[in-house]
């Protein structure tokens, strides 16, 4: 994941609770409700999504490249008594063996990985057969919104530590060999541009011959 603005982890940690109250808390909980079994969280950030782990999850591991974010997530997990193995890593090179997880969660992270295709290929590799890619992402909009996101993508990317607001994430997930039929668009939210609309749900690997 791109490291551009060194202050971003702290700005994110201060500002994100506001967006959580306005919008994300509800959708984080809904997205996490799709996770089961052995869960990997890619791009854990400050660990907010750990608060919404469903009973169906049996173990939790996470990769996060930013030391400040890892410290915040570890502190949150300790406060709430959550057992999680947080390791230094990036989505493009996940440090776990093949078929290690029943679910892999990406929450507001595919916008900022350096290589979306490589990240999704790695997620596919570590998912066990029948596993789920659990998704909550902001994505490129249609029409004027999409053009606006294209226009400000570069300055926004620097400001937000590599976040690109104009990524066509559902297309990338489909191209990586996932069935996107359980993903849906949330077009109207209280989150301001350029971080809207959103994509939520889960995807599974397309079976050979399907």
Give the ranges of each region predicted by the language model.
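Conserved alpha-helix/loop element of class I SAM-dependent methyltransferases that forms part
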Residues: 18-38, 48-52
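Class I SAM-dependent methyltransferase SAM/SAH-binding core
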Residues: 40-93
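A short acidic, Gly/Pro-enriched loop at the edge of an enzyme's catalytic core
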Residues: 92-104
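A short SAM/SAH-binding and catalytic strip from SAM-dependent methyltransferases
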Residues: 103-115
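Conserved beta-strand signature within the Rossmann-like core of class I S-adenosyl-L-methionine
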Residues: 130-138
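Short alpha-helix
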Residues: 162-177
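Core SAM-dependent methyltransferase catalytic element
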Residues: 185-210
């Amino acid at each position: 994941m791109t490291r551009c603005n060194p202050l971003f982890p702290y700005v994110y940690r201060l500002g994100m609770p506001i967006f959580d109250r306005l919008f994300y808390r509800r959708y984080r909980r809904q997205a996490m409700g799709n996770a089961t079994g052995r869960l990997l969280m890619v791009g854990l950030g400050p660990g907010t999504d750990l608060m919404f782990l469903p009973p169906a999850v049996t173990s939790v591991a996470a990769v996060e490249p930013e030391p400040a974010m890892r410290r915040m997530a570890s502190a949150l997990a300790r406060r709430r008594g959550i057992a999680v193995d947080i390791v230094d890593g990036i989505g493009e090179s996940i440090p776990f063996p093949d078929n290690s997880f029943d679910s892999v969660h990406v929450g507001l992270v595919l916008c900022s990985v350096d290589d979306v295709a490589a990240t999704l290929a790695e997620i596919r590799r570590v998912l066990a057969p029948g596993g789920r890619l659990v998704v909550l992402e902001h994505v490129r909009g249609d029409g004027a919104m999409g053009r606006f996101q294209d226009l400000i993508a570069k300055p926004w990317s620097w400001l937000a530590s590599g976040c690109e607001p104009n990524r066509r994430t559902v297309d990338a997930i489909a191209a990586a060999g996932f069935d996107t039929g359980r993903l849906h668009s949330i077009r109207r939210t209280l989150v301001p541009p350029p971080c809207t609309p959103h994509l939520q749900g889960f995807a599974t690997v397309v079976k050979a011959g399907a």
